């Protein structure tokens, strides 16, 4: 197969390939960018593989940065954008089931592609658009299949995170893992315990945010991968409920964790501990905990202005999305958003009075002043007082 037109990302990087080839070496676009181009999807990162060793690349180009030279990767800065170029390599020994114990630079593209995870990611493209497909990756693209390169057992022993990548690609691309590859995942699922939680987190989040979330979740469950993720080992029923939800795509990380923790039946405190185990960011944890307070009130239509105010707009939006997913009842989303918009204040700083003004009018600093401000804040939110300095001062006195 030969492409006659190039995506802009490839066109911009072509001078890199041409300069390497002019020096007598091979160079190709490789990996996910080639796959996504063939699928008509947006290209995010352009990866280049070459037969030139790092020292040779640094002789060819004037401006380079050693971003991962021990693994053969050099960033080239000569043509505006930074492009990472990696020498063809083989890898041996995977004591931690994630990183190779040793890397050997080679001159063979085939040897380099053999070590890649899936056939759809083991594609290379020449500067003239010719696609190099040594493992039937194009056929698998057309069949919407995710198949390990070579022996699946070996690929997952080399890097156990690849098992999570498989189910993530199912979700992102709407593909299906082949029977042989799925059997290997089931066989080696326990190796996932060797992988850093942060890396599992990234893949799980991409799985949950994909266009075919149910596909990825189904394999995630059927292979037993879930048993080796933080606090999910005994949560099969909740995960099954997750697969049964409507297919609406989730874009926000907080929305993902809100629906997960809600279906797990967690309290805000339990969710906080759960998400700490998953190494989630503090702002995500805070949003999920707030969502777990608001969500049941949206489902029962019992939320008042104070509930909406405490949650804030961002939490309200994700809570409404999840509410629509977890119930067959109609959720009046527009009405809830309108009620939020009508709030006199959206945050404490919007209050027409503050501690300084109160002290100027006879209040002493201390707990009483803080309590007075809290009472005024609540009364304004609940429309029991107008948000004017005059009215609030009068009420405070």
Swiss-Prot record:
CDD domains: NT_ClassII-CCAase. GO terms for molecular function: ATP binding; CCA tRNA nucleotidyltransferase activity; magnesium ion binding; tRNA binding. InterPro entries: Bact_CCA-adding_enz_type3_sf, CCA-adding_enz_C, CCA-adding_enz_firmicutes, NT_sf, PolA_pol_head_dom, PolyA_RNA-bd. Its cofactor is Mg(2+). Its EC number is 2.7.7.72. Transmembrane segments: none annotated. ATP binds at residues 32, 35, 116, 159, 162, 165, 168. GO terms for biological process: RNA repair; tRNA 3'-terminal CCA addition. Keywords: ATP-binding, Magnesium, Metal-binding, Nucleotide-binding, Nucleotidyltransferase, RNA repair, RNA-binding, Transferase, tRNA processing. The keyword Nucleotide-binding applies. It catalyses: a tRNA precursor + 2 CTP + ATP = a tRNA with a 3' CCA end + 3 diphosphate; a tRNA with a 3' CCA end + 2 CTP + ATP = a tRNA with a 3' CCACCA end + 3 diphosphate. Pfam families: PolyA_pol (PF01743), PolyA_pol_RNAbd (PF12627), tRNA_NucTran2_2 (PF13735). CTP binds at residues 32, 35, 116, 159, 162, 165, 168. SUPFAM superfamilies: Nucleotidyltransferase, Poly A polymerase C-terminal region-like. Mg(2+) binds at residues 45, 47. A single active site specifically recognizes both ATP and CTP and is responsible for their addition. Homodimer. Belongs to the tRNA nucleotidyltransferase/poly(A) polymerase family. Bacterial CCA-adding enzyme type 3 subfamily. Catalyzes the addition and repair of the essential 3'-terminal CCA sequence in tRNAs without using a nucleic acid template. Adds these three nucleotides in the order of C, C, and A to the tRNA nucleotide-73, using CTP and ATP as substrates and producing inorganic pyrophosphate. tRNA 3'-terminal CCA addition is required both for tRNA processing and repair. Also involved in tRNA surveillance by mediating tandem CCA addition to generate a CCACCA at the 3' terminus of unstable tRNAs. While stable tRNAs receive only 3'-terminal CCA, unstable tRNAs are marked with CCACCA and rapidly degraded. This is CCA-adding enzyme. It comes from Latilactobacillus sakei subsp. sakei (strain 23K). The gene is cca.
């Amino acid at each position: 197969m030969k492409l006659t037109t190039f995506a802009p990302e490839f066109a911009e990087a072509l001078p890199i390939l041409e300069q390497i080839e002019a020096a007598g070496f091979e160079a190709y676009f490789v990996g996910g960018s080639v796959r996504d181009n063939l699928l008509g999807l947006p290209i995010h990162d352009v990866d280049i593989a070459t037969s030139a060793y790092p020292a040779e690349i640094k002789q060819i180009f004037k401006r380079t940065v050693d971003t991962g030279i021990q693994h053969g990767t050099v960033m080239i800065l000569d043509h505006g954008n930074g492009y990472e170029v990696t020498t063809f390599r083989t890898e041996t020994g995977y004591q931690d089931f994630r990183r190779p114990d040793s890397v050997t630079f080679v001159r063979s593209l085939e040897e380099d592609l053999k070590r890649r995870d899936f056939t759809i990611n083991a594609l290379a493209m020449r500067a003239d658009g010719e696609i190099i497909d040594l493992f039937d990756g194009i056929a698998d693209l057309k069949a919407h299949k995710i198949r390990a390169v070579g022996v699946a057992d070996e690929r997952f022993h080399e890097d156990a995170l690849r098992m999570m990548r498989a189910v993530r690609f199912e979700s992102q691309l709407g593909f299906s893992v082949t029977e042989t590859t799925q059997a290997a995942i089931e066989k080696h699922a326990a190796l996932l315990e060797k992988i850093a939680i942060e890396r599992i987190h990234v893949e799980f989040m991409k799985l949950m945010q994909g266009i075919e979330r149910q596909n990825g979740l189904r394999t995630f469950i059927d292979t037993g991968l879930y048993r080796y993720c933080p606090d999910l080992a005994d949560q099969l029923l909740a995960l099954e409920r997750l697969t049964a939800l409507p297919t609406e795509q989730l874009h926000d990380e907080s929305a993902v964790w809100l629906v997960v923790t809600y279906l797990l039946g967690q309290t805000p405190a339990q969710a906080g501990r759960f998400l700490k185990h998953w190494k989630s960011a503090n702002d995500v944890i805070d949003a999920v905990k707030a969502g777990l307070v608001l969500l049941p009130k949206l489902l029962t239509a019992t939320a008042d202005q104070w509930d909406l105010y405490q949650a804030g707009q961002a939490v309200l939006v994700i809570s409404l999305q999840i509410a629509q997913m977890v119930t067959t009842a109609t959720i009046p989303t527009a009405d809830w958003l309108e009620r939020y918009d009508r709030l006199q204040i959206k945050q404490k700083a919007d209050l027409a009075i503050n501690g300084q003004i109160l002290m100027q009018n006879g209040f002493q600093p201390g707990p009483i002043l803080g309590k007075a401000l809290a009472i005024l804040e609540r009364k304004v939110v609940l429309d029991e007082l107008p948000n004017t300095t005059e009215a609030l001062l009068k009420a405070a006195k």
